[in-house]
């Protein structure tokens, strides 16, 4: 993290506050009639994934951890509570946990045992960020630290993230995970603001920018993960879907991520209908309509609406707050002074 002086940051906020507050007061979420086009998308083929059962850690999970090790959080030893509650989220002593998403594990393999007409079947499902076409996390972030690039990769700039976790609250799959004891809030107001920083898969955005394949794809021995040009990926996913549907001869949905939350850059294809997978996941974790998922364990519900797009009041309530506008303006100036850390 860039060294940020508390006094300097508040000075920057003071400079930015007038313009930022007036700007935020006029801004409203954009409702674009045309859907943006991104260059890249990916397929996760559940029919190919075997979970690397013979290994202690699946290869995609290990490759992701190796690649992102420099980006993992290193919290202070004496972590302050989330004022006014005496709690905080700390995964630093559970870094080896690969059974769910954490700030130290950005992808994991979900293992399900299914009862099908052909008998019991075991399936393995790589889970990570879906990289939505219209990311709710980006829209709701009050400080503008979440971005989506031309390749469709959604990234969090943990340098300026306050860890308020609003991104996780509005993410349909609860993907971003919070680590306390790190982040800019420790420099600014450790007892009054934020709660750390948020972390998640960024689709190896730095590699995609150089036309290189992400770590999970290059490490998979079964070819279960494929990145490529968006139109080609969508065409290929439809072809695989039709093939699986014909072989299964069962009614159901064999593709996931194409329509959920308004569409994503991650397409799952499966030889078993997602209705069955979703039901098995619900039973395994006792998911209910009121509690459809657990922290770090995303669901597979077929009906996923982009509720931020349909609830502009939710965005306005966050983005129009004067303090938020001032801090967001300060962050924008600080980021411009800092430059793009990924370009170095």
Regions found by a protein language model. Name each.
Residues 1-344:
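Non-ligating segments of multi-cofactor redox enzymes
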């Amino acid at each position: 993290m860039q060294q940020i002086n508390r006094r300097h940051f508040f000075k920057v906020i003071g400079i930015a506050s007038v313009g930022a507050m007036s700007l935020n007061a006029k801004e409203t979420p954009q409702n674009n009639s045309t859907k943006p086009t991104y260059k890249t998308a990916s397929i996760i083929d559940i029919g190919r994934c075997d979970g690397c059962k013979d290994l202690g850690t699946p290869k995609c999970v290990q490759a992701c951890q190796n690649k992102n090790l420099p980006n993992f959080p290193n919290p202070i030893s004496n972590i302050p509570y989330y004022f006014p509650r005496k709690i905080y989220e700390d995964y630093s002593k559970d870094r080896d946990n690969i059974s769910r998403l954490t700030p130290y594990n950005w992808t994991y393999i979900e293992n399900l045992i299914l009862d099908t007409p052909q008998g019991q079947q075991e399936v393995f499902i790589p889970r990570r960020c879906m990289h939505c076409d219209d990311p709710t996390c980006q829209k709701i972030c009050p400080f503008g630290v979440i971005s989506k690039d031309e390749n469709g990769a959604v990234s969090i700039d943990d340098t300026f993230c306050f860890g308020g976790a609003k991104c996780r609250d509005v993410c349909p799959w609860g993907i971003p995970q919070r680590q306390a004891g790190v982040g800019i809030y420790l420099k600014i107001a450790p007892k009054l603001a934020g709660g750390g920083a948020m972390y998640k898969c960024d689709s190896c955005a730095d590699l995609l920018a150089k036309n290189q394949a992400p770590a999970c794809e290059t490490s998979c021995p079964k070819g279960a993960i494929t990145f490529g040009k968006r139109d080609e990926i969508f065409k290929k996913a439809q072809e695989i879907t039709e093939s699986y549907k014909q072989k299964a001869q069962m009614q159901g949905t064999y593709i996931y991520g194409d329509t959920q939350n308004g569409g994503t850059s991650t397409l799952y294809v499966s030889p078993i209908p997602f209705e069955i997978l979703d039901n098995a996941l619900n039973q395994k974790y006792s998911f209910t309509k009121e509690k459809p998922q657990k922290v770090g364990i995303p669901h597979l519900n077929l009906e996923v609406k982009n509720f931020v797009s349909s609830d502009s009041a939710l965005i306005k309530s966050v983005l129009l707050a004067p303090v938020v506008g001032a801090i967001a303006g300060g962050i924008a100036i600080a980021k411009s002074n800092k430059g793009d850390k990924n370009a170095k």
